[in-house]
Every structure is written in C-alpha cells, then in structure tokens.
Amino acid sequence: PNCPHAVIDILPEQKSIEGLGGNMRLGGRDVALSPDTQAWRLLGQTDSVRMRFRHRYEVDPQYIDSLTAKGLVFSGKAPNQPIMQILELPDHPYFLATQAHPCMTSRPLEPQGLFLGLVAAARQHACPDQDLPGPVQAAQKVNQVKSTHKHPGEKTDVRKRKRVKNS
C-alpha cells in the first residue's frame, strides 16, 4: 500500500468498505476464459465458468500490458471488469494461479480441473520415465467420465454440474 509501484493492490470498489465481511469479493462469480490456454483446457474448453471467490486484491490494471509483454498470460478474467482471475506461464509445465478457491467447487468424485492439472503435473515431474497423462489429458479424461457418470436414482445436469433427483 505504501510502495511506489503496487502491482497487487486492493480492489478499488473495496477500498471504502469496512465492517462485517470487510472489503472482500465473496461468493460465486463468472470467469471468462481465454481460448487455447491451459485454464481453458483444464476447465472444459468453455467460454466461461462459475468459480468461488474470497479475496480483496487484484493486479493493478496499469501493469497488465507490461506483464503480458514478458510472457504472463491472464487466462481468466471477470467478464465486465478489468479484474484478472487466472494467470499462467504457457512455457512452464504447470504454472497456473487463481484468485478463486477451486476447493469450493471440487467434489471427491468430481474433482475440479485445476486440481487435476496440479496432481497430473506433479506426477509427471516425479516420474518422468513413466508414460503418464499430462495435466490437460488428465482433466479431459475426468470431464468425459463426469459427463456420463450418474449415481443411482439421480441424473446429472452437466451444464450446471448439479445433481437433480429423478422423478
């Protein structure tokens, strides 16, 4: 806050908020994904996803161009605001960061794509001599299973990733 170049700073709309809950961006938010990025591939090759957030900081928009000029990719953004939600380095095996909490949308039988990518990248790094699926391949396999997996007495609305009771 008292530095000359605050690349990461508190969200402008949050600066004047005080009291219960404080100055946080909370809850479910849509994230627009950039095509052909690792985040886009891990999260199902879709234009946008709904993710859960609990943060108060952002990349100061005046630094975005200089960061992207050096190779950083902001692959997930707030749809109608200059808030960067996911970033990655494309030339790294798995350098991906998010403001979201993937743990809030991950389930034991339906792991969130960013977690799958992390585990697959760690396995590949730990066992380079084994033929293991990479982060994207692992997420794609699980997404295929998710779209066909049904629990007894339930059906899955794949678009919303929500289970509903059969009538």
Where in this protein do the model-derived segments appear?
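Amide-donor transfer/coupling interface in amidating biosynthetic enzymes
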Residues: 1-167
